Amino acid sequence: MILTLTLNPSVDISYPLDQFNLDTVNRVSQTSKTAGGKGLNVTRVLSEFGEDVIASGFLGGALGQYIEEQIETTRIKQAFFKIKGETRNCIAILHEGQQTEILEKGPTIELKESEEFKSHLLKLFKETDVAVMSGSLPKGLNTDYYADIVRLAKEQGILTILDSSGQSLEEVLISNVKPTVIKPNIDELSQLLNYKVTNDIKELKAAVSQPIFNDIEWIIVSLGSEGAFAKHNQKFYKVNIPNIKVVNPVGSGDSTVAGIASGLIHQQTDEELLKKANAFGMLNAMEQQTGHINTDKFDEIFKQIEVIEV
């Protein structure tokens, strides 16, 4: 089973406007509300592809209940941990071809809740083969909280995928127990190394071979429209992708993570895993809805992706 963790989920609200006027009333004719968070995008895509997946994380208050109810309608398994705080809203105002976002920080997790959640995870780990950790940490959690989860998972023989950035990712990289997979984009890779990394293959090889990445089995670097670059143990790969009509790229990284998780749990070859991961990301970008793929188009896209050992 694949376990997805969304520790700072949200109710994502979208307000489309022809024009956004400051300091006055803006009336919205259509509103969309969805259960949001990077891990939930991963969950939905895995479920659409038919994988055995369960979603967990922190939920609280009326908004947390709304997320639970939304997930129930999709029949996706869930095992969220209830907290005293209120789950957050994230608002996107879509106007004149632009997107203005208002993101709440979310609840503060109490120390007791953070410790009890680890016990909650240990129960879920009994049936877990792959654990996916996505997104930011809520307030109240130590920056090394993901590192703690990776350690607990590894003790149970579980493969782990971490899709995070900033200090929470850095804490994992300096810990003595490493995740199976990390998936930085080129900007996040540059931030970790404190120098600008380009798409040049030699530069990418040197970058992912830095000591900070020692003992991480898979490093998969998204290169946007240029595909991806990957290191698996001592092998390096360049992934070339076909041109597609991009409808909505939001959530494509999360969909790529879903493909990685699917590849891991089925013990697929390096080429198959990388092609599946990139196909999932592209299929998401071809759809209007975030965290959604048209599985009928999977084979067509999969066949067009090229993986070259470099």
UniProtKB/Swiss-Prot annotation:
The keyword Transferase is annotated on this UniProt entry: yes
Stored PROSITE patterns: PFKB_KINASES_1, PFKB_KINASES_2
GO cellular component terms given for this protein: cytosol
Enzyme Commission code(s) on record: 2.7.1.144
Keyword Nucleotide-binding: yes
Gene3D superfamilies, per database record: 3.40.1190.20
Pathway(s) of this molecule: Carbohydrate metabolism; D-tagatose 6-phosphate degradation; D-glyceraldehyde 3-phosphate and glycerone phosphate from D-tagatose 6-phosphate: step 1/2
Principal EC category: transferase
SUPFAM superfamilies documented for this protein: Ribokinase-like
Entry keywords, A to Z: ATP-binding, Kinase, Lactose metabolism, Nucleotide-binding, Transferase
Family assignment from sequence similarity: Belongs to the carbohydrate kinase PfkB family. LacC subfamily.
Name of the protein this chain belongs to: Tagatose-6-phosphate kinase
Protein source organism: Staphylococcus epidermidis (strain ATCC 35984 / DSM 28319 / BCRC 17069 / CCUG 31568 / BM 3577 / RP62A)
Lineage: Bacteria, Bacillati, Bacillota, Bacilli, Bacillales
Gene this chain is encoded by: lacC
